[in-house]
Curated annotation (Swiss-Prot):
SMART domains cross-referenced by the UniProt entry: KRAB, ZnF_C2H2
Name of the encoding gene: ZNF544
Transmembrane segments: none
Ranges for domain KRAB: 14-85
Function of the molecule: May be involved in transcriptional regulation.
Name recorded for this polypeptide: Zinc finger protein 544
Main location: nucleus
GO molecular-function terms, A-Z: DNA binding; zinc ion binding
Length: 715
């Protein structure tokens, strides 16, 4: 033994501090209970390795080391300091203490064979020490990075959902602050090429049989599945950039490599019986089994549907209307996060998807949410107004109507919205994008709903039917407006005059009569109108367009209302009846003017002579007597007339046309008034009576001549 001791020089001795990892006060306080427990386990494991190498170190020293760390934690709680400001100072102090203790705690290495030279013994011990220390550092680094990623995921979900969801316990139990990995030593040169993968573990400990543990392709399980490109990339043979040095296996994401490396460094106690693969952590086995057996161990609080991964469930709960920016081109499925999008390959290979029993639609999870469309179940109720919803996401969006929250703001105009989908559709106004095109006429629309309504023009579909009269409509709002004609409901009331309307648009147009607003101006003559429809019909005067044609006689009209009135000449329809005398009229204004003959009302008075009339057209004609205006001129003889009807009758003197024929004697006349006077010859009717002597005449002109005999007037 003495000779063997002489082979190793004093400077080759290795102490516990060479391979153990120490924390400062600030660093220790940042660790939670689980992280501190893992630290103790790793420290004890390090002690076991040192003992196996023949280095003398009592277990009480290790325990005292851990107790000192606990004392540091209590001291920090009593007198907290800013860990960022003192981190460098503590690091330097630790290096000084470590240097002093290396001089006073030398341990003799005696297990190397006598045939081995001292330099080889020293190299083995130093290599093992470096590997143990590196394993310890990387194990703790993995723990911190895992917590950081989970905590970042929780913050992201809470930010997007606005606190509207309860996250799984895996995320909700995380501390509000976590230590960073900047305080850990850098990996050695053996893994510098993978520096971007901060969680990489390069630990070369062999299994119990002295051989490297084999990692089968389809039997891997990793604790952070959300950060992987998923097993689908590995199964399809896609090349992975991260390679584990010991086993030669390639992994498709850094966190996969991180956890995969642990299978070579700690005891493997959980066995997956399907593939004979051993897993170093129970979480790995728990998440491995659903891959083989299709079992789901995480349940959705909203729909009671189950998922195979807890973090997958978080993203399932996050999904909602308009919140799915990632889309799979193979199945046109949309996802709220890129990690879910990469999961699509696994979902697409599912052999037994969930199928709705009522409509046959298939789902990969959360089928019960869809079934609520059939059952009408709405379990999520607003506490303020009592309105219910089938999904919790819809309730979160609805509650923003009460709070006024609009978290999605347009960068161009500053307008805010309650949903991201509404912001996306709004931005099309600025970009001019119209992604929805009609395949029939190639017309494009900003919104898909507008395209659906437009396509009903081509198909003639009118899915909204009135239950009272059976009339159908292509849009739902048209049916709602139509029903008000049956109920008499007029919910839109003018605040100035109290007049009510069945449509909001009619109220808006009516209010312009009070304000005098006429926003629609003709580019040709400058005339303005309160409605766009009136401007369109006015412009037909300039263009001469008459798009409405009578199918009976071929006559055309500028306005559809004129065509409707004209068609009553052919049908003989007179829908407007006088309640006093029973006389009927084809137009409403004719009935209004007729009623004035019973009441004697003459609201239209001439400002020149004071004569009054019961119709506005009569006043207009009368005013032409004072002005002498005769705007209607004959093209053949240049004779002018005050009325267009006079010009039409005059032109028949040139053409010889006599379209009005007596049915009794066959005599024809150029004007309808002449035919009417002629009919009185056959009927004996004399409607014009003298008020002085009671004598009657067939024509008004005959009465005028007769009255001169009483007045003595000489024309």
């Amino acid at each position: 033994m003495e000779a063997r001791s002489m082979l190793v020089p004093p400077q080759a001795s290795v102490c516990f501090e060479d391979v153990a990892m120490a924390f400062t006060q600030e660093e220790w306080e940042q660790l939670d209970l689980a992280q501190r427990t893992l630290y103790r386990e790793v420290t004890l494991e390090t002690w076991e390795h040192i003992v196996s190498l023949g280095l003398f170190l009592s277990k009480s020293d290790v325990i005292s080391q851990l107790e000192q760390e606990e004392d540091l934690c209590r001291a920090e709680q009593e007198a907290p300091r800013d860990w960022k400001a003192t981190l460098e100072e503590n690091r330097l102090n630790s290096e000084k203490d470590r240097a002093r203790e290396e001089l006073s705690h030398h341990v003799e290495v005696y297990r190397s064979g006598p045939e081995e030279p001292p330099s080889l013994v020293l190299g083995k011990v130093q290599d093992q020490s470096n590997q143990l220390r590196e394993h310890q550092e990387n194990s703790l680094r993995f723990m911190v990075l895992t917590s950081e990623r989970l905590f970042a995921q929780r913050e992201h979900c809470e930010l997007e959902l606005g606190g509207g969801y309860s996250l799984p316990s895996t995320l909700s139990l995380l501390p509000t602050t976590l230590p960073t990995s900047t305080g850990f030593p850098k990996p050695n040169s053996q893994v510098k090429e993978l520096k971007q993968n901060s969680a990489f573990i390069n630990h070369e400990k062999n299994g119990a049989d002295g051989k490297h543990c084999e990692s089968h392709q389809c039997a891997r399980a990793f604790c952070q599945s959300i950060y992987l490109s998923k097993l689908g990339n590995v199964e399809t043979g896609k090349k992975n950039p991260y390679e584990y040095i010991v086993s030669g296996d390639s992994l498709n994401y850094g966190s996969s490599l991180c956890f995969h490396g642990r299978t070579f460094s700690v005891k493997k106690s959980d066995d997956c019986k399907d593939y004979g693969n051993l897993f170093s952590h129970s979480v790995s086995l728990n998440e491995q089994k659903p891959v083989h057996f299709g079992k789901s161990q995480y349940e959705c609080d909203e729909c009671r549907e189950t998922c195979s991964e807890s973090l997958c469930l978080v993203q399932t709960e996050r999904s909602g209307p308009g919140e799915t920016p990632f889309r799979c081109e193979e199945r046109c499925a949309a996802f709220p996060m890129a990690s879910s999008f990469s999961d699509c390959n696994i979902i697409q290979t599912t052999e037994k998807p969930s199928v709705c029993n009522q409509c046959g639609k298939s789902f990969s999870c959360c089928k019960l949410i869809h079934q609520r469309t059939h059952t009408g179940e709405k379990p999520f109720e607003c506490t303020q107004c009592g309105k219910s919803f089938s999904q919790s996401y819809d309730l979160v969006i609805h509650q923003r109507t009460h709070t006024g929250e609009k978290p999605y703001e347009c960068d161009l105009c500053g307008k805010s919205f309650t949903q991201r989908s509404k912001l996306i559709t709004h931005q099309r106004i600025h970009t001019g994008e119209k992604p929805y095109q009609c395949i029939e006429c190639r017309k494009s629309f900003r919104w898909n709903s507008n395209l659906i309504v437009h396509q009903r023009i081509h198909t003639g579909e009118k899915p909204y039917e009135c239950t009272h009269c059976g009339k159908s409509f292509s849009q739902s709002y048209e049916l709602v407006t139509h029903k008000r004609t049956h109920t008499g409901e007029k919910p839109f009331k003018c605040t100035q005059c109290g007049k009510s309307f069945s449509q909001k648009y009619d109220l808006v147009v009516h209010q312009r009569t009070h304000t005098g607003e006429k926003p629609y101006e003709c580019n040709l003559c400058g005339k303005s109108f309160s409605q766009s429809s009136k401007l369109i019909t006015h412009q037909r005067i300039h263009t001469g367009e008459k798009p409405y044609q009578c199918i009976e006689c071929g006559k055309s009209f500028r306005w559809n209302s004129n065509l409707v009135i004209h068609q009553r000449i052919h049908t003989g329809e007179k829908p407007y009846d006088c309640t006093h005398c029973g006389k009927s009229f084809s137009q409403s204004y004719q009935l209004v003017a007729h009623k004035r003959t019973h009441t004697g009302e003459k609201p239209y008075e001439c400002n020149e002579c004071g004569k009054a009339f019961n119709r506005s057209t009569q006043l207009i004609r009368h005013l032409q007597i004072h002005t002498g205006e005769k705007p209607y001129k004959c093209n053949q003889c240049n004779k002018a007339f005050a009325r267009s009807s006079y010009l039409v009758m005059h032109q028949r003197t040139h053409t010889g046309e006599k379209p009005f024929e007596c049915s009794q004697c066959g005599k024809a006349f150029s004007g309808s008034s002449n035919l009417l006077s002629h009919h009185r010859i056959h009927s004996g009717e004399k409607p014009y009576e003298c008020s002085d002597c009671g004598k009657s005449f067939r024509q008004q002109s005959q009465l005028v001549v007769h009255r001169r005999t009483h007045t003595g007037e000489k024309p």
